[in-house]
């Protein structure tokens, strides 16, 4: 949503074709199924910037060739040590780089909140009652979660 509102042409890399409808609703212009070799080959050299939001260790090597010369893959999720998994050849030959970024401070956060308010951008969440927290946790373990869970504090009995 944010990248689209900022005027970027947005492409979603996904392992699941089931995410296409939501991705388009959220502002993606293009979808690349990362498990499809033909789609990944067609995306070669297409991107100046990839923002990697995946919050667990995964192989980034298939994505490096999709970066243009001087392109950058930026991690915003903490993965820990990925060094044994990264091939430097595509980075050296394509002048590609890998970077990391954290959430901004108070001023940057307020700026983004103001931008979201001006553009009608809100988070997509799944509201749950506190009584359903164990079920939500089980769903999370099974990767049966579409959006972030948010606990309805009104359901908390004091």
Give the residues covered by each predicted segment.
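Short glycine-centered segments of the SAM/dcSAM-binding site in methyltransferase folds
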Residues: 71-73, 97
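Conserved SAM-binding loop of SAM-dependent methyltransferases across substrates and taxa
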Residues: 1
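C-terminal hydrophobic helical "lid"/dimerization subdomain
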Residues: 106-158
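Adenosine-nucleotide cofactor-binding segment
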Residues: 4-62
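Helix-to-beta-strand junctions that scaffold the AdoMet/dcAdoMet cofactor pocket
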Residues: 67-69
């Amino acid at each position: 949503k944010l990248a689209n509102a900022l005027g970027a042409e947005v492409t979603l890399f996904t392992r699941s074709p089931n995410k296409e409808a939501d991705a388009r609703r959220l502002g993606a212009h293009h979808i690349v199924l990362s498990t499809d070799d033909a789609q990944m080959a067609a995306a070669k050299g297409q991107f100046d910037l990839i923002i990697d939001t995946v919050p667990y260790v995964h192989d980034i090597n298939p994505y490096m060739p999709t970066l243009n010369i001087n392109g950058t893959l930026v991690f915003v999720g903490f993965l820990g040590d990925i060094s044994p998994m990264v091939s430097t050849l595509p980075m050296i030959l394509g002048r590609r780089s890998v970077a990391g970024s954290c959430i901004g401070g108070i001023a940057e956060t307020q700026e983004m909140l103001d931008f979201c308010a001006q553009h009608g951008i809100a988070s997509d969440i799944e509201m749950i009652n506190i009584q359903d927290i164990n079920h939500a946790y089980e769903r999370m373990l099974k990767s049966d979660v579409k959006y972030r869970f948010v606990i309805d504090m009104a359901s908390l009995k004091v």
